Each structure stands twice: as structure tokens, then as C-alpha cells.
């Protein structure tokens, strides 16, 4: 039964989502920092308000953390962070940039050939590593490359964003939403790939055709490129040994996760030991090179700034740029991102801090403490560059946001909203499998934009389908799960940056590099690929279900 508490819970949930999409920073008295209400803080504040209003209780909070209905949030986050650490440390070795240079050489001076090769490369890398590491390295590389080659950056960057997010639907570890679906619908991890591989292939091909259609003008993708010099792919492979070890460990972890899923074993029990082993290797290997005075990451970096600076220098020198002020700017905005402040700006948390002025004695003490902390950080970064470069790149903002979303949606369920939404789903589809595919798929794409990233949309729709499951056939439930998998991944290629964490990350990196992509521009160039992929992807899901059932 819907009560006043139910209405209040829904209203607070919607308001919190509004602040996720459009974050604000509330001014306060001068000596107190401004209060940001955004992706990290808005859901937590909503939980606090609902708890104070007695709209939820500790049992609901516990259910949002431990999990209900087979969905285990801690399982999802441990798995995602474990694999993210391995993927990011692999990226730090320079293997992604090396692959980009190799592909660039293969493309030569043919503009469309190079555009196609980059699309294929980014797609394959995103399948294996997930979209976040590819967005991190691929975006920075394309910014530099398009500047050097004097190309229109928007066509290349939008292609990269679409390729990375579309490819993340293949493996269950490609996106946190995939793990939510596997957990929530009890889909075997290997079966997940079997179901999504055909929709992915169709979406990827038609997405490229849509991109090619809207960028057919030579001002976006020229027929011939002015820059034809070969790039040295080996020069940016900063740690060949680390690349080999990291590739082997990541591949082994993924294969074992797929295998153990057949035996009902939680996959985080596999991924976490691999991540710990990779951490031990990183620390030991960095220590060995430090003691033996071997080049760290292949270029002898000595601190947080050194690593990023050198990586850009290698990129720009290999690309043979001659603009000195560009070099200076690139050094300052280097990748890997070395500090947590930069990561905060990437996620666009809008933390505007007004420093209060302490008394002189206190100021001296604070300055001394800060100086020691900076010196210690530089020393540790010089000793263990792999870990201290990877640490700020881990998606820590995902932790409070994901848990908060689970708790808020658990609160909606506690107040009876999931039963209401489930009833609406049944009335709209009458339990028909094909209607369910299209309704869940289209709703999934829309909700990615208006429900606080694709993670929130996936959690919400998973709960709705489960609420309606007693009146749905097993085939319809499975079809809804696959439709949601397709929608939650292509939904990131959408109208708002906040449709996914990858979108916020992508916008932040571009902002750092001095490229401003407006919300309108982002929506305009994504509209055609999104519509095409939605129609094609859901049509393939319907065809799959027709053949299987």
C-alpha cells in the first residue's frame, strides 16, 4: 500500500537523482568550505533525510549493503575494483598507447582506414579491459594525436566513446551493470557473454555505420592525412615485463571467473586474490628496480609529476610535434593522472574549497606538516610508481554512489514501489516476451539519463522485473535481463554525461586538456548512434529469444 512515507521516499529519491545529473555547490560562511551536492554526496544525504524521517530503518540499509534477492552489492564492488586495479596497472605499463601507435602506423595516411582501425582497436581493448581504462588512455592519446595531425577532434573522440561503451556489454566484468544483471537474474557469467555477443556485434557494426554517416564530410574525417610519419610503438611501452605479467594475470583471472561461475562460486573470491597477487608483484617489482637503480616505468621517473610528464613527452616526440607551447601544456596535463585532486575534477564533483586562514603559529605548523606529507608522497611515488599512479585512477567515487543507490532502491522496495512498478510492467506487456524486451530496453536507455547513471537504472529495473517475476515466464525474465544488459551499456552513449561514470570521466579528461564538449554537442552527436543501436540491439535480442524459446 502506498502511504505518505512512500511518496516522501520517491520524492527524495528523484531529487537526489536531480543533483547527480546537475550538481551544485552551496555557499556557506567564509571560514567553512562550500558544500557540494553531487554524485557522491546527494544519495548519502537522501539516505540521511529518509532515515531521519523514518522512511527507512537499519534493516533497509543493511539490505542495501549486504544485498537482497540474490543481488550482493559487496560482491559486485569487490569484483569490479579487483579487475579495475589489474586493468589500470596494465595500462600504466604503456601497452594501450603502444597498441594505439601500432594501429596508427597501420592506418598510414588514409583517413578512413585509420578511423576504422582505431574503432576496431578501441572495441577490442574495451572488451578485454572494460571501458574505464580505455577511456582514460584512449581519450588522452586521441587529443594529442588529433592536435598533431590537425584533425577535427570531435569525430574521433565521439567514436572512441561509443566504441568503448558498446564493447563493455560482452563480458560480465566489462561494466558494473553487467555484474548487477548476472547477480540479480542468476545469469551464468559465460552464458551472459553467449547472450550478448550477437547484440554487441550488431550494435558495434551499425554504430560505426551511423558514425560514418554523420562524419562523412571530409572536415571530420579527411580522405588523406597530412601527418604520415611512423610512430615508435616500443617507445611508449614503458614496462614490457610488467605488461606481460599484467596481461597474463588479467587473462587468467577472467578465464577463472568464467569457469567458477558454472559451480555457483562468488567470482570475487577469484578476482580478489588475483588483484592482491598483482599488488604484491607491483610492489616487489618496483622495489627491485628502485634498489637496482633501474629505470622506473622505463623512463626513470622520480616523482608524481615525472611519470606523467615523461609519458606525454614520449607521445609528443613520437608524434613529431614541433609546437613548444603545446609541449608545455601537455606536460602539465599529463596522463597517468597523478593526484587525487585531478581524479575529483575528472568525476566533476565540483568541490570548490575556500581555505580558512589560521593563526600564524597554526599556519606554520600546517605548512610544515604539508611539506612533510608532500615529500613523503614523492618519495613513495618514486619507490613504488606503479601503485601510486594506479591508486588515484581507481573509481573510488563508485563505492559511496553504488551503495547509496542500492540502499535508496531498497528503500523504494520497502515502501512498496517495486510492487507498483512491477504491476505497471505487467499491465503494459501482459507478460509477452517481446513487449517486455522492448519496454525494458527502451526504458533502460531513457533511465540511464535520468536515474543517476546506468548503474542506478540497472538496479532499479532489475528490482522491478524481479517484483513482477511471479507473473512472468522464465523465458520472459531471461529476455528482460538481456535487453537490460544491452540497454545499460549502449545507454551510456546517450544524451547526458551522467548517463555513466565513463561519461563523467571522459568529460573531465577533455576539460583538463582544454577541450570543452557541451551537453548539447554530446547529445547531438550521440543521438543517431544511440537510436540505431537501440533498434538493432533489441531486434537481435528478440531474434535470439525467438530461436532459443
Place the predicted regions along the sequence by residue.
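Hydrophobic transmembrane alpha-helices of multi-pass small-molecule transporters
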Residues: 1-92, 199-200, 212-423, 517, ...
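Cytoplasmic-side transmembrane-helix entry/capping segments in multi-pass membrane proteins
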Residues: 33-45, 101-105, 111-117, 121, ...
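Membrane-embedded alpha-helical segments and adjacent helix-loop junctions characteristic
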Residues: 58-152, 384-388, 392, 396-478
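Hydrophobic residues within alpha-helical transmembrane segments
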Residues: 117, 121, 159-162, 197-198, ...
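The feature identifies polytopic integral membrane transport proteins across all domains of life
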Residues: 132, 153-161, 165, 180, ...
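Re-entrant/interfacial helical elements at transmembrane boundaries that shape
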Residues: 133-144, 157, 171-185, 420-424, ...
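Transmembrane-helix bundle segments that line or gate the permeation/cavity pathway
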Residues: 150, 154, 160, 171, ...
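C-terminal transmembrane helix pair
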Residues: 194-200, 400, 404-407, 432-549
Amino acid at each position: 500500500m502506498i502511504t505518505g512515507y512512500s511518496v516522501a521516499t520517491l520524492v527524495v529519491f528523484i531529487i537526489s537523482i536531480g543533483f547527480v545529473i546537475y550538481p551544485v555547490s552551496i555557499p556557506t560562511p567564509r571560514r567553512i568550505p562550500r558544500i557540494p551536492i553531487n554524485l557522491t554526496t546527494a544519495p548519502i544525504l537522501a539516505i540521511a533525510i529518509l532515515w531521519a524521517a523514518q522512511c527507512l530503518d537499519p534493516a533497509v540499509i543493511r539490505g542495501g549493503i549486504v544485498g537482497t534477492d540474490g543481488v550482493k552489492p559487496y560482491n559486485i564492488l569487490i569484483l569490479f575494483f579487483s579487475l579495475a586495479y589489474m586493468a589500470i596497472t596494465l595500462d600504466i605499463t604503456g601497452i594501450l598507447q603502444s597498441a594505439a601507435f601500432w594501429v596508427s602506423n597501420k592506418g598510414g595516411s588514409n583517413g578512413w582506414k585509420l578511423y576504422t582501425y582505431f574503432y576496431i582497436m578501441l572495441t577490442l581493448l574495451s572488451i578485454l579491459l572494460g571501458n574505464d581504462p580505455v577511456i582514460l588512455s584512449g581519450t588522452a592519446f586521441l587529443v594529442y594525436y588529433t592536435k598533431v595531425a590537425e584533425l577535427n577532434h570531435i569525430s574521433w573522440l565521439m567514436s572512441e566513446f561509443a566504441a568503448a561503451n558498446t564493447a563493455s556489454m560482452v563480458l560480465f566484468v566489462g561494466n558494473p551493470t553487467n555484474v548487477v544483471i548476472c547477480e540479480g537474474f542468476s545469469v551464468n557469467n559465460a552464458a551472459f557473454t553467449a547472450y550478448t555477443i550477437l547484440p554487441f556485434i550488431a550494435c558495434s557494426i551499425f554504430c560505426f555505420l551511423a558514425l560514418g554517416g554523420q562524419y562523412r564530410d571530409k572536415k571530420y574525417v579527411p580522405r588523406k592525412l597530412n601527418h604520415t610519419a611512423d610512430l615508435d610503438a616500443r617507445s611508449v611501452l614503458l614496462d614490457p615485463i610488467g605488461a606481460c605479467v599484467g596481461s597474463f594475470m588479467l587473462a587468467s583471472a577472467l578465464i577463472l571467473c568464467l569457469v567458477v561461475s558454472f559451480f555457483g562460486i562468488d567470482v570475487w573470491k577469484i578476482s580478489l586474490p588475483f588483484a592482491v597477487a598483482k599488488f604484491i608483484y607491483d610492489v616487489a617489482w618496483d622495489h627491485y628496480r628502485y634498489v637496482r637503480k633501474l629505470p622506473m616505468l622505463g623512463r626513470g621517473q622520480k616523482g608524481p609529476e615525472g611519470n606523467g610528464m615523461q609519458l606525454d613527452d614520449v607521445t609528443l616526440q613520437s608524434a613529431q610535434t614541433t609546437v613548444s607551447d603545446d609541449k608545455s601544456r601537455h606536460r602539465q596535463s599529463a596522463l597517468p593522472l597523478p593526484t587525487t585532486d585531478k581524479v575529483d575534477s575528472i568525476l566533476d564533483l565540483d568541490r570548490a574549497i575556500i581555505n580558512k586562514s589560521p593563526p600564524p603559529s597554526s599556519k606554520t605548523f600546517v605548512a610544515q606538516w604539508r611539506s612533510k606529507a608532500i615529500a613523503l608522497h614523492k618519495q613513495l611515488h618514486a619507490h613504488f610508481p606503479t601503485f601510486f599512479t594506479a591508486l588515484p585512477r581507481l573509481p573510488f567515487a563508485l563505492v559511496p554512489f553504488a551503495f547509496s543507490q542500492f540502499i535508496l532502491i531498497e528503500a523504494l522496495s520497502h515502501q512498496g514501489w517495486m510492487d507498483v512498478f512491477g504491476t505497471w510492467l505487467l499491465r503494459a506487456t501482459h507478460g509477452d516476451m517481446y513487449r517486455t524486451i522492448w519496454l525494458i530496453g527502451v526504458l533502460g536507455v531513457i533511465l540511464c539519463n535520468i536515474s543517476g547513471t546506468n548503474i542506478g537504472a540497472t538496479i532499479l529495473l532489475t528490482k522491478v522485473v524481479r517484483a513482477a517475476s511471479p507473473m512472468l515466464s522464465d523465458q520472459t525474465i531471461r529476455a528482460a535481463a538481456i535487453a537490460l544488459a544491452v540497454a545499460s551499456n549502449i545507454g551510456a552513449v546517450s544524451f547526458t554525461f551522467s548517463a555513466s561514470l565513463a561519461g563523467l570521466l571522459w568529460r573531465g579528461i577533455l576539460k583538463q586538456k582544454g577541450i570543452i564538449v557541451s551537453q548539447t554537442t554530446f547529445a547531438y552527436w550521440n543521438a543517431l548512434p544511440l537510436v540505431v543501436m537501440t533498434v538493432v540491439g533489441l531486434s537481435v535480442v528478440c531474434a535470439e529469444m525467438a530461436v532459443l524459446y
